[in-house]
Curated annotation (Swiss-Prot):
The modification Phosphoserine is found at S126, S129, S486. Interacts with GSK3B and FLII. Interacts with PDPK1 in a phosphorylation-dependent manner. GO terms for molecular function: ATP binding; calcium channel regulator activity; chloride channel regulator activity; phosphatidylinositol binding; potassium channel regulator activity; protein kinase activity; protein serine kinase activity; protein serine/threonine kinase activity. It comes from Homo sapiens. This is Serine/threonine-protein kinase Sgk3. Residues 139-151 have a biased composition (Polar residues). GO terms for biological process: intracellular signal transduction; negative regulation of extrinsic apoptotic signaling pathway in absence of ligand; protein phosphorylation; regulation of cell growth; regulation of cell migration; regulation of cell population proliferation; regulation of DNA-binding transcription factor activity. Its main location: cytoplasm. Belongs to the protein kinase superfamily. AGC Ser/Thr protein kinase family. Residues 1-21, 121-156 are annotated as: Disordered.
């Protein structure tokens, strides 16, 4: 007889917290949304709620459970609702309110509380018999389905909201296009993927992982951010920051290698981004010059999160064989368990390439290159400083347990003498002028993109949307494989 895991799930005591709140703007209106993290057993997900929704739940519960003496912060009639201290204080009060809800079974089993926390949504329930990859692909799955927009909710995005101007990139599943939003004339990079190709290659988990990671990127200056995601019956759309300083790969091809001070600057910004991802239990796994963009003034922006692995803490490991051959760490090639330190190996490989012009163990024959990565000693040529030699040797250490970053992760990178002349606080605030400026002419300048892409004709099919084919965050999505893909920020807060 099969065990009823759903019943186990419902009997579990949830834990909740409000890690952050965000201010949103649309049509000159400002509003605050509180991000609630819900954990039950092996499952975790985010629910986005406005103050009005907390207030409604509170008023329902206080009538039914007067002895509980529940409290939430009062509505503010006068004063600045967006004062940081006020928002911080309100968030703390709302956090205390939901903590009280999960202390007592009679409260957290109340239908309104379960609905508020989305506890009965089937996609949040996990079967202990599932393997690690299956569980992690569902973890923190579908932020968008948890946004309760109410009767005046945000209209979903759709292809006809944009003018698609140029092809600026291509990948295995589709194209990246420069697009201008008709509403306000803002420029975005829109990644358009063919569902059929994704499904045929069984890559839907990676696409959903990419979407989940993109939603968490908004807090870091060196990671590309997601504005919208939506889908039609045939395609998936990511609406992203348009970063038009060109790929690091593009500039490396033109210049062969970079001076050490320039390579150091890029390596530091890349390391900062990787350190942030590691801090939220994400391993990037695909660092390479093609995935490193420069913005309009020359700062680094990491993109393409399809190979990211979620839910990996510093002491955790995973085993999936993935990445780009030139940058694979030895433990990945050996199909051994690996951890965050694969990203530090990749940082070493990219830094080596920036300084010397080629990846450290490069060979046209992939089998021979793998053998080089596994067994060949690192070759360091003259022309760089002793601290550069040192960090390359420590990052490109074949034994992951002895690699720089193995013990204290990003902190070890920060403290290496190679970065001694650099202020990390200034770096993350973009106070250090980039050593190279791409000199873009404007927000729609595409000179730093390969003409092999930009001269292509924009496919008409990416621009087409009809009402029956659009699927968005507020309705049941047509294809179960991509449930939770769509995302749009909420449009207004009823009680600021």
């Amino acid at each position: 007889m099969q065990r009823d895991h759903t019943m186990d799930y419902k009997e579990s005591c949830p834990s909740v917290s409000i890690p952050s709140s965000d201010e949103h703007r649309e049509k000159k209106k400002r509003f605050t949304v509180y991000k609630v993290l819900v954990s039950v057993g092996r499952s975790e997900w985010f629910v986005f709620r406005r103050y009005a929704e907390f207030d409604k739940l509170y008023n329902t519960l206080k009538k039914q459970f007067p002895a509980m003496a529940l409290k939430i912060p009062a509505k503010r009639i006068f004063g600045d609702n967006f004062d940081p201290d006020f928002i911080k204080q309100r968030r703390a009060g709302l956090n205390e309110f939901i903590q009280n809800l999960v202390r007592y079974p009679e409260l957290y089993n109340h239908p309104d509380v379960r609905a508020f926390l989305q506890m009965d949504s089937p996609k949040h329930q996990s079967d202990p018999s599932e393997d690690e990859d299956e569980r992690s692909s569902q973890k923190l799955h579908s932020t968008s389905q948890n946004i309760n927009l109410g009767p005046s909710g945000n209209p979903h995005a759709k292809p006809t909201d944009f003018d698609f101007l140029k092809v600026i990139g291509k990948g295995s599943f589709g194209k990246v296009l420069l697009a201008k939003r008709k509403l306000d004339g803002k420029f975005y990079a829109v990644k358009v993927l063919q569902k059929k190709i994704v499904l045929n290659r069984k890559e839907q988990k990676h696409i959903m992982a990419e979407r989940n990671v993109l939603l968490k990127n908004v807090k870091h200056p060196f990671l590309v951010g997601l504005h919208y995601s939506f889908q039609t019956t045939e395609k998936l759309y990511f609406v992203l920051d348009f970063v038009n300083g060109g790929e690091l790969f593009f500039h490396l091809q033109r210049e062969r290698s970079f001076p050490e001070h320039r390579a150091r600057f890029y390596a530091a910004e890349i390391a900062s981004a990787l350190g942030y991802l590691h801090s939220i239990k994400i391993v990037y796994r695909d660092l390479k010059p093609e995935n490193i963009l420069l913005d309009s003034v020359g700062h680094v922006v990491l993109t393409d999160f399809g190979l990211c692995k979620e839910g990996i803490a510093i002491s955790d490991t995973t085993t999936t064989f993935c990445g780009t051959p030139e940058y694979l760490a030895p433990e990945v090639i050996r199909k051994q368990p690996y951890d965050n330190t694969v990203d530090w190996w990749c940082l070493g490989a990219v830094l080596y390439e920036m300084l010397y012009g080629l990846p450290p163990f490069y060979c046209r024959d992939v089998a021979e290159m793998y053998d080089n990565i596994l067994h060949k000693p690192l070759s360091l040529r003259p022309g760089v400083s002793l601290t550069a030699w040192s960090i390359l040797e420590e990052l490109l250490e074949k034994d992951r347990q002895n690699r720089l970053g193995a013990k204290e992760d990003f902190l070890e990178i920060q403290n290496h003498p190679f970065f001694e002349s650099l202020s990390w606080a200034d770096l993350v605030q973009k106070k250090i002028p980039p050593p190279f400026n791409p000199n873009v002419a404007g927000p729609d300048d595409i000179r730093n993109f390969d003409t092999a892409f930009t001269e292509e004709t924009v496919p008409y099919s990416v621009c087409v949307s009809s009402d029956y084919s659009i699927v968005n965050a507020s309705v049941l999505e047509a294809d179960d494989a991509f449930v939770g893909f769509s995302y749009a920020p909420p449009s207004e807060d009823l009680f600021l």
